[in-house]
């Protein structure tokens, strides 16, 4: 983790050299990382699209085998195999930003320059957001991002809990980490919007 933090720090310093503000540098840094993750995102969205398409079939299986969990699980996995769907295939792109989050947190805590780096209303990117604006944005953007890819209404409560959890976590983290998370969420929301729009366009043409 220390090695990753060191390289991330070097990349951030390189960006800061050109933009002149660490807050802006974190935003540019985040966009750069998200662009690198685009191939994984496309794979994730393709998998989620397939999951959404077979959701009516899954609901039929629940009605048919709802009283037999073991049979339901077997038939569901059989359906996934027939449709060539890996239900866990979309997890990696969701985890990669989190994997970067901890080294970034370490970097923000160990780089002395960040303790005096200001951005907008924040006097230090190594400290918590004093007005809780970043945690609120983290909560809202996390919910919007997860709600856009939800396959059924039953996931809404889970999305709310996850969003509140991320908001609470962001309260305890340096503002710089929160800026990274909010920027990452906004980038993902835009990605999902474009993907969904393109999918509808293709359906209309077919």
Swiss-Prot record:
Single GO term (MF)? membrane insertase activity
The cellular location(s) given in this protein's UniProt record come to: Cell membrane
Out of the domains of life, which is the source? Bacteria
Q: How does it sit in the membrane?
A: Multi-pass membrane protein
**What do the Gene Ontology cellular component annotations say?**
plasma membrane
InterPro entries registered for this protein in UniProt: YidC/ALB3/OXA1/COX18, YidC/Oxa/ALB_C, YidC_ALB_C
Gene Ontology biological process terms, A to Z: protein insertion into membrane; protein transport
Annotated keywords = Cell membrane, Chaperone, Membrane, Protein transport, Transmembrane, Transmembrane helix, Transport
**Membrane-spanning residues:** 22-42, 88-108, 130-150, 160-180
Subunit organization: Interacts with the Sec translocase complex via SecD. Specifically interacts with transmembrane segments of nascent integral membrane proteins during membrane integration.
Q: Which NCBIfam families match?
A: yidC_oxa1_cterm (TIGR03592)
Q: What does this protein do?
A: Required for the insertion and/or proper folding and/or complex formation of integral membrane proteins into the membrane. Involved in integration of membrane proteins that insert both dependently and independently of the Sec translocase complex, as well as at least some lipoproteins. Aids folding of multispanning membrane proteins.
Q: Which family does it belong to?
A: Belongs to the OXA1/ALB3/YidC family. Type 1 subfamily.
* Name used for this protein in its record: Membrane protein insertase YidC
Name the lineage. Answer: Bacteria, Bacillati, Bacillota, Clostridia, Thermoanaerobacterales
Q: Which gene encodes it?
A: yidC
């Amino acid at each position: 983790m220390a090695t990753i933090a060191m390289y991330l720090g070097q990349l951030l310093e390189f960006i800061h050299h050109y933009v002149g503000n660490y807050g802006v540098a974190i935003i540019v840094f985040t966009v750069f990382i998200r662009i690198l993750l685009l191939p994984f995102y496309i794979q994730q969205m393709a998998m989620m699209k397939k999951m959404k398409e077979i959701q009516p079939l899954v609901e039929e299986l629940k009605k048919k085998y709802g009283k037999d969990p073991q049979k339901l699980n077997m038939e569901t996995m059989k359906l996934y195999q027939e449709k060539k769907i890996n239900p866990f295939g979309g997890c990696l792109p969701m985890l990669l930003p989190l994997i970067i989050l901890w080294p970034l947190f370490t970097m923000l805590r160990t780089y002395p320059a960040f303790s005096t780096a200001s951005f907008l209303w924040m006097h230090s990117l190594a400290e918590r957001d004093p007005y809780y604006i970043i945690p609120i944005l983290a909560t809202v953007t996390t919910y919007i991002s997860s709600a856009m890819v939800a396959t059924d209404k039953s996931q809404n409560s889970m999305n709310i809990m996850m969003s509140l959890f991320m908001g609470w976590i962001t309260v305890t983290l340096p503002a710089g980490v929160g800026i990274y998370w909010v920027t990452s969420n906004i980038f993902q929301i835009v990605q999902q919007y474009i993907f969904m729009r393109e999918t509808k366009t293709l359906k209309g043409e077919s």
